[in-house]
């Protein structure tokens, strides 16, 4: 054995990166083919914490590469009093994921992905102005906007459910995600999505 061979250390196996040290991304399936490029959940985007401090707003479409749990965490930091309190929202998401696992026995990442797929509206209506008259026209929704809107609706539903309620926001977020993943109309996001699609259908 030469001196050089002795000096080279054996390459250690890269450890399996698990979110919060618990949840693996390996077995997460994205069943909607149109959203596969916009829900960043594969090993490439695996993180221990949903806090990468990346500059995802610097370029168009770059936010699609932001890990999906981090996007949920960022969206929970809404309404003036919560702005910038990312550690608080990381704690909320961690607690919510533990509740989801206790209630369903599934990987919370899979529940989150299913909830996002189910609560993103496929059709919406936009305002078209013609010669002084404004009418609404049904339009298809792009995949990135579907993901954006789904995350926003899920967080809004959890926030409104927790307001003036004995339940904590983590419990409300867990309930919202579980109901949305099932496609249940108890979910705020599913109700809003159905309403948007119904309005769009009437404006075709």
UniProtKB/Swiss-Prot annotation:
Major place of residence: cytoplasm
Entry's Gene Ontology cellular component terms: cytoplasm; cytosol; cytosolic small ribosomal subunit; nucleolus; postsynapse; presynapse; ribonucleoprotein complex; ribosome
Cross-link (Glycyl lysine isopeptide (Lys-Gly) (interchain with G-Cter in SUMO2)): 47
Entry-annotated residues carrying N6-acetyllysine: 47
Matching InterPro entries: Ribosomal_uS7, Ribosomal_uS7_CS, Ribosomal_uS7_dom, Ribosomal_uS7_dom_sf, Ribosomal_uS7_euk/arc
SUPFAM superfamilies: Ribosomal protein S7
N-acetylmethionine modification, residue list: 1
Locations listed in the record: Cytoplasm; Nucleus, Nucleolus
Record key words, sorted: Acetylation, Cytoplasm, Isopeptide bond, Nucleus, Phosphoprotein, Ribonucleoprotein, Ribosomal protein, Ubl conjugation
SS bonds (residue pairs): none
Record carries keyword Acetylation: yes
Phosphothreonine modified-residue sites: 14
A molecular function (GO) term: structural constituent of ribosome
Family designation: Belongs to the universal ribosomal protein uS7 family.
Assembly behavior: Component of the small ribosomal subunit. Part of the small subunit (SSU) processome, composed of more than 70 proteins and the RNA chaperone small nucleolar RNA (snoRNA) U3.
Role noted for this protein: Component of the small ribosomal subunit. The ribosome is a large ribonucleoprotein complex responsible for the synthesis of proteins in the cell. Part of the small subunit (SSU) processome, first precursor of the small eukaryotic ribosomal subunit. During the assembly of the SSU processome in the nucleolus, many ribosome biogenesis factors, an RNA chaperone and ribosomal proteins associate with the nascent pre-rRNA and work in concert to generate RNA folding, modifications, rearrangements and cleavage as well as targeted degradation of pre-ribosomal RNA by the RNA exosome.
Protein name from the UniProt record: Small ribosomal subunit protein uS7
Organism: Mus musculus (Mouse)
């Amino acid at each position: 054995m030469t001196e050089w061979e002795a000096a080279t250390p054996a390459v250690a196996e890269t450890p399996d990166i698990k979110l919060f040290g618990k949840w693996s991304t390996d077995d997460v399936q994205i069943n909607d083919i149109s959203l596969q490029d916009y829900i960043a959940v594969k090993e490439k985007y695996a993180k221990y914490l949903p806090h990468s401090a990346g500059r995802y707003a610097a370029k168009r479409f770059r936010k699609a590469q932001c890990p999906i749990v981090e996007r949920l965490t960022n969206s929970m930091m809404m309404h003036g009093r919560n702005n910038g309190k990312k550690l608080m929202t990381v704690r909320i998401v961690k607690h919510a994921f533990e509740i989801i696992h206790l209630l369903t026995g599934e990987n919370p990442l899979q529940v989150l992905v299913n909830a996002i797929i189910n609560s993103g509206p496929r059709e919406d209506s936009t305002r078209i102005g013609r010669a002084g008259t404004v009418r609404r026209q049904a339009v298809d929704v792009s995949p990135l906007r579907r993901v954006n809107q789904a995350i926003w609706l899920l967080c809004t539903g959890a926030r409104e459910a927790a307001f003036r309620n004995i339940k904590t926001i983590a419990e409300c977020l867990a309930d919202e995600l579980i109901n949305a993943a099932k496609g249940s109309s108890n979910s705020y996001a599913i109700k809003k999505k159905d309403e948007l699609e119904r309005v769009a259908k009437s404006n075709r």
